[in-house]
Amino acid sequence: MIGKRINLTAVELTNNFSKYYLKFAFRITKVEGKSAFTDFGGTECLRDYLSRMVLRRVRRIDTVQDLVTSDKRKIRVKGLGVTGRRVKSSIQVKISNKIKDMLKSIVETSTLEEFVDGMISDEIKSSILREVRSIYPLRNFEVRKTEIIP
């Protein structure tokens, strides 16, 4: 039983139906009687939700980073930005670099719990959309996956 992975949706955890597309993973670390204690394992967006974001004649901008939170937890953060239409590759690179810089500063100044709370409350999403707008307006941004690195 120890080490088993449990997946739950954000709706089951928070009763927030606007986050229907977000799945949480937990790993069982300890069992006492009928109670199981878990540790956070990561998040993931549903493929259906991501494929609805990325349509024809838009640009998908993916970022992948290995970062360390302020409570010394190593996580891999995968972001997805979507532009409203096709853009030059130089603009894509600038957007990607800006997203990476912002995610790095957000993760390194917050604990894992604060980072996940920011994902659920859309604070991270709105701040990145606001900052990247100076380069090129994004249609949408989402942290599509987070993983705990052992």
Residue map of PLM features:
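Hydrophobic-cavity lipid-handling domains and compact docking modules
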Residues: 1-87
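Positively charged, low-complexity, intrinsically disordered RNA-binding extensions
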Residues: 93-150
